[in-house]
Design a protein with these regions (language model features):
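Short structural boundary motif marking the start of a folded domain
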Residues: 2-7
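Structural motif
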Residues: 10-12, 71, 268
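Short, contiguous acidic and Ser/Thr-rich linear segments
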Residues: 12-21
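Short, structural beta-strand-to-alpha-helix junction motif
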Residues: 21-26, 51, 65, 233, ...
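A basic, amphipathic helix-loop patch mediating RNA/tRNA/ribosome contacts
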Residues: 22-54
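Short cysteine clusters
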Residues: 42, 47-50, 62, 97-100, ...
Length: 436
């Protein structure tokens, strides 16, 4: 295994000592390469001012670790030359105060390159609104009138893994198992771990990056379930999950911005154990399970049994999430998923809920209502006797807390109203409201 990280920076091959793998990409770009077009705004992956493009997808360089670039191609605003996104921004007078403009340009560049989703989705992760926003949208529409002015450049990069005491990036499951030990910190996309650097000023050590492990990047569609590898990102899993039910696709579209979804992983969201993680309620409601592995030993755990307390899980030392199994809905089953937050895009949920009824069997799961995402067994049992009895039972299942996002009363009232909405909806398809 190598002791260097290799990637392309604006088509130039770059080798960096693996010891620097735990630095943020933004810090390395500005301090080591003097590429200061990429700006720091929020330092937590929310505002998009630091957007760069990795393999045609936008990422937030403020929380993206340098080591994650191994084997990839990085483009910064300095590498665009005269791209249609830049030309359209100039012609439409899309520059605001200027500080966030490079981030907007890079988000538009990524949208131009991959042409996935809507323009509004592409810009949802860029939050600067200091002056006229309409010209930026106009630029996003106009740039497609122009042809590319540059061609992609590719260079053969090393195919083996990276290993250093501070940072490792294995390429195979065998390499990963050789590196795992109880003190290792497993890294998926870094959308949460990166905050420990930028906000808590931690110096990470013994980090093992999972994103290059081939076996963890598999996504298989079986007749009765999906099997999603532990390193599959939200962006990669979105289409398959959206086919299970439209509500899941709509909910995932609101999980962070495009920059977060491009590198954040479903398994990372699960392992993080946040009580307000957006993916867990719908996965629990569907009856999902986790394949856990340590060495040659494997076991399967239902996701609803995975959490043992606030940000505590059933993972044992040296164990990792190999894959997530997501059952498909049976014919005739009713399902809905809801996300309630103050802001429609790029916001943390106050309440996240999923309701699944198949015949006489009900599975209700909620986030933001307890120390962990959890089922509502009393409400499930009461639902057959009427929605009002089920709503009353929710108050027995959960005793939510008050915080800066919502009061306990608000959370419980919203959860009850969402259950009423599910019961009354003819199609049982959720309408993802901004307000309750």
């Amino acid at each position: 295994m190598r002791s260097t990280i290799e990637f392309l920076l604006n088509s130039e091959r770059v080798c960096v000592p693996a010891a620097q793998g735990t630095r943020t990409l933004l810090a390395w770009l500005r301090e080591e390469r003097r590429l200061t077009g990429t700006k720091e705004g929020c330092a937590e992956g929310d505002c998009g001012a630091c957007t760069v493009v990795v393999d045609s997808l936008p990422v937030c360089s403020c929380i993206y670790l340098l080591g994650c670039l191994d084997g990839k191609s990085l483009t910064t605003v300095e590498g665009l030359k005269e791209h249609p996104a830049q030309r359209a921004m100039v012609e439409c007078h899309g520059s605001q105060c200027g500080f966030c403009t490079p981030g907007f340009v890079m988000a538009l560049y990524a949208h131009y390159q991959n042409r996935q989703g809507t323009l509004c989705d592409a810009l949802a992760g860029n939050l600067c609104r200091c002056t006229g926003y309409a010209p930026i949208l106009a630029a996003g529409e106009k740039m497609f009138q122009y042809e590319k002015t540059q061609s992609s450049s590719f260079s053969q990069l090393a195919q083996d893994g990276v290993h250093h005491r501070r940072f490792s990036a294995p390429r195979t499951l065998a390499e990963l198992q050789a590196l795992l030990h109880p003190g290792a910190t497993l890294l998926g996309g870094g959308t949460d771990l990166g905050l420990s650097i930028t906000k808590q000023l931690r110096e990470l050590d013994n980090v093992v990056y999972l994103g290059n492990v081939a076996e963890l990047r598999e996504l298989d569609d079986f007749p009765d379930h999906l099997r999603i590898g532990g390193a599959v990102t939200y962006t990669e899993a979105h289409a398959a999950l959206a086919r299970l039910h439209p509500d899941i696709g709509e909910l995932l579209r609101r999980l962070g911005g495009a920059q977060v979804r491009a590198c954040g992983t479903l398994a990372g969201n699960i392992a993080n154990g946040s009580p307000i993680g957006d993916s867990m309620p719908f996965l629990i409601a569907l009856g999902s399970s986790l394949e856990l592995q340590s060495g040659s030993r494997q076991r399967t755990v239902l996701l609803e049994n995975f959490y043992t307390g606030y940000r505590k899980t059933a993972l044992q030392p040296g164990e990792f999430i190999r894959a997530i199994r997501v059952p498909k809905l049976a014919s005739g089953a009713r399902f809905a998923a809801y996300k309630i937050s103050k802001r429609f895009d790029q916001d943390i949920s106050a309440v996240c809920a999923a309701f699944h009824v198949d015949g006489k069997n009900a599975r209700f799961a909620l986030g933001g209502m307890a120390a962990t995402p959890a089922r509502a067994p009393r409400a499930e049992a009461a639902f057959a006797h009427g929605v009002e009895k089920a709503c009353a039972a929710l108050a027995e299942d959960f005793k939510p807390l008050s915080d800066h996002r919502a009061s306990a009363w608000y959370r419980l009232t919203v959860a009850q109203n969402l259950l009423r909405k599910f019961s009354e909806a003819k199609s049982a398809r959720a309408i993802l409201d901004l307000q309750p």
